[in-house]
Amino acid sequence: MKLYDSYSNQLVEINDELISIYNCGPTVYNHIHIGNARPLITMDVLYRFLKKHNIKTKYVLNITDIDDKIINYALANNLKELEVSEYYFNEYLKIKKALNTLEMINPKVSTHMDKIIDYIQKLIDKQAGYFIGDDVYFDTKKALNYGQLSKRDLENDIVGMRIESAANKHNPNDFILWKKTNKGIMWNTPWGIGRPGWHSECSCLINTYIGEQVSIHGGGIDLKFPHHENENAQNQVLYNKNLAKVWMHFGLVNINNEKMSKSLNNFILVKDLLAEYDYQVVRWFFYQADYKQPIKFSHEIMKQNEKEILKIKNAIYNAKNYLYFNNQLKSLTQIDHFELFDERINDDLDFVGIVDLIHISVKKINILIKENKDMNELKLNLTQLLYMLDILGINFVDLHNDENLALLNTWKNYVDKKDYVKADELRKQLINIGIL
């Protein structure tokens, strides 16, 4: 498998015996919007593919449940921070399930504070952490090739961009590891009472759950700087290596030609989208573009995706009906690989090529049914389609149970006997079920 690495700007082959994945998860102070869903769904496809091929995989997606946004929300609403974060964490789990994503490890920042404090102490011991009063800062000059991941000019581009301002910083790009505070939740440390900076949390969790280097680190492209750059800098200081072998960055979701974000107040919550569209449609939307590139959202686009999903579903049900009427449904088996599809997944998750393959497969199935072609070829094309959709996390309810098959058989008998009145009545029932 080759994936595009944002650090080297090259395709990098991943062939680790155990492929480890870390995906930057949500800050749980609100419901997630569809921009947050893109990394979740894209990485789920990769994870499904690896598991399907029995490749040892460890997938970690963190939960940031300590953050100024959470604290401010809690104070404004007379709540405890962890009450807020726990509520939205559980809402996030519901969304993950509704989107049909596989389970992964979800460590919370709040339950790993001892590890984070130890991690920061190691940076201090390496003389990469220094004090300004009771705050601890990271000295970016101690990191090898700082700025390489985000491809920024340190002197001209980075200064002033989401960098904590403080007098007496060694370098304008230095960032906070631990900040003293008397507001909100806090922990006691050898350096005083406070809470950690955002960048140390993720790098520490990777170190805790995976080790000195993760195979694949994913996240939205808007996290490349400063978050991922600063994660990487800490790891370079501690272990003299990049934090990840491959940095995967996912393109933004745009609405009205603007980045969708909570700060711009132009976001659409996933829970609201799922109230309007089936999860299959939402997932299918994200496969319409290269995962690295921006993707445009509109309800017109979603309606088109809805039509395409219906066409795919109808092809599957029609093929199963056809096989049933020809006594071939029971002999339908699963496959564990499909070379054309696997090649596209292994080629940096070529979603555009995969979508084309699925459209071709649906067209073939419809032609084979219409022209009463070779039954084995129909079964092969159907199993290939089901294999592809399963890895894309798109499944449909199997309506071909004994009860529905009996109804289908009765309907077919009415048609054969030209009893069209009864056939039409039963056909309406089968349409309501969804099998016709």
UniProtKB/Swiss-Prot annotation:
Q: Where does Zn(2+) bind?
A: 24, 202, 227, 231
Q: Which InterPro entries does this chain map to? A: Cys-tRNA-ligase, Cys-tRNA/MSH_ligase, Rossmann-like_a/b/a_fold, tRNA-synt_1_cat_dom, tRNAsynth_Ia_anticodon-bd
- The primary location reported for this protein is cytoplasm
- List required co-factors: Zn(2+)
| One Pfam family, short name | tRNA-synt_1e
**Which residues take part in binding ATP?**
262
Its UniProt entry gives the catalysed reaction(s) as: tRNA(Cys) + L-cysteine + ATP = L-cysteinyl-tRNA(Cys) + AMP + diphosphate
Under Enzyme Commission nomenclature, its number is 6.1.1.16
Give the quaternary structure: Monomer.
Q: How is this protein named in the record?
A: Cysteine--tRNA ligase
Primary gene name? cysS
